[in-house]
Curated annotation (Swiss-Prot):
Cystine pairings recorded for this chain: none
Family: Belongs to the Smg family.
Domain of life: Bacteria
Gene coding for it: smg
Protein name: Protein Smg
InterPro entries: Smg
Species whose genome carries this gene: Escherichia coli O1:K1 / APEC
């Protein structure tokens, strides 16, 4: 499922391709690309839930409104988000790429992923997908994109 999301993000969203794609055509394109129908369905459902935030149909759980409060992760969240992922989320809050609300959106979308393995690089892409889809987060998206690509470019040299 995560592979389908990455493919969609890189092919349709990140490349600024036509964003209004017929769902049947999209499903066929993904099938032709070799993705499993169940993974396609789950990825599209995941994106649909993300779009609910964009349209104001869903709101992330608000655990605290005090920016100085500390987020305590549940055992399920700790299982999916290791210490490096949780530390990265805290770092993004401290540099104001994420706020309390967008952090909770990211965590909720991470937990909704149907994947056995999840690491820091995967988290970075989920953060990009969430920020891309939330109105008013354009600057945060740009900062996150710069963080992601600066680090990856630095690894190539």
């Amino acid at each position: 499922m995560f592979d389908v999301l990455m493919y969609l993000f890189e092919t349709y969203i990140h490349t600024e391709a036509e964003l209004r794609v017929d769902q049947d055509k999209l499903e066929q394109d993904l099938t032709d690309a070799g993705f499993d129908r169940e993974d396609i369905y789950n990825a599209l459902l995941w994106l649909e839930k993300l779009a609910d935030y964009q349209e104001g149909l869903a709101e992330p759980m608000q655990l605290a409104s005090d920016p100085l409060s500390m987020r305590i992760y549940t055992p399920e969240e700790c299982e999916r988000l290791d210490a490096s992922c949780r530390g990265f989320l805290l770092f993004l809050e401290q540099i104001q790429v994420l706020n309390l609300e967008t952090r909770e959106m990211v965590i909720e979308r991470v937990l909704a992923l149907d994947t056995a393995e999840f690491d820091l690089e995967d988290l970075k892409w989920v953060i990009l997908m969430v920020l891309f889809n939330i109105p008013g987060c354009e600057n945060a998206y740009q900062q996150m994109e710069e963080l992601l690509f600066e680090v990856n470019e630095g690894m190539l040299h």
